[in-house]
Amino acid sequence: MPIQPLKKELVSFLEPYMPENAGVLGEQEKPYVILTYAQSLDARIAKIKGTRTIISHQETNTMTHYLRYKFDGIMLGCGTVLVDDPGLNCKWWPDDEPKPEHFAEHSPRPIILDPNGKWKFEGSKMKTLFDSGDGKAPIVVVKKLPEVVEENVDYLVMQTNFTGKVDWHDLFIQLKSQFGLKSIMVEGGGIVINDLLQRPHLIDALVITVGATFLGSEGVEVSPLIEINLKDISWWKGTRDSVLCSRLVSHS
């Protein structure tokens, strides 16, 4: 389905938080990382665990594709990928350029966090888009290589701790050094978002879409275990959604 035209004021609103304005992409050890997701007014990202919930208005959905145009990589946890079967490609292109025949060139590289090897590239929407030239093949983060290595997939083997999670700092460094990803947008899901919110030193910016809806107490909540403060805060108000851009205050 075609996306709506991008609101021009969104471009200037997002500009200070984009990787090209960081000024350190070639210098710092890790990539430029933003955390971006859509939530309800009661801080839910899904109505019920294990189900897909559309929160964003079409104009902020276009904003998501604009962000994908700006970033080298896009990261999701395998739980969200198994539920949503996302394409993770980019359908936006600049007005002063002709419509591309295929969208792979403008799309970020998918990064799937799948330590236990639950997700398969074959049969996914990502594979369909890759085959048609409209998306890139993924990097799959695992704790050990699968018995059957899928064609066109790059595997990044990372050790996990006793809770089954990877070391985020090491992961970001490896994604830059091994795959040349200088900027990464992290889209979810809930476990990933909550975990990274507690590590403000790793997150360069937040871009949060707040939809005009309540999803209820059974929804999947975004709420870190500790207090998190923000700085450099900006708000944009759309037809139905509002968008918050900010940076996180590092722990003292």
UniProtKB/Swiss-Prot annotation:
Pfam families: RibD_C. Catalyzes an early step in riboflavin biosynthesis, the NADPH-dependent reduction of the ribose side chain of 2,5-diamino-6-ribosylamino-4(3H)-pyrimidinone 5'-phosphate, yielding 2,5-diamino-6-ribitylamino-4(3H)-pyrimidinone 5'-phosphate. GO terms for biological process: riboflavin biosynthetic process. It comes from Kluyveromyces lactis (strain ATCC 8585 / CBS 2359 / DSM 70799 / NBRC 1267 / NRRL Y-1140 / WM37). Its EC number is 1.1.1.302. GO terms for molecular function: 5-amino-6-(5-phosphoribosylamino)uracil reductase activity; NADP binding. NCBIfam families: ribD_Cterm. It is an enzyme of class 1 (oxidoreductase). This is 2,5-diamino-6-ribosylamino-4(3H)-pyrimidinone 5'-phosphate reductase. Belongs to the HTP reductase family. The gene is RIB7.
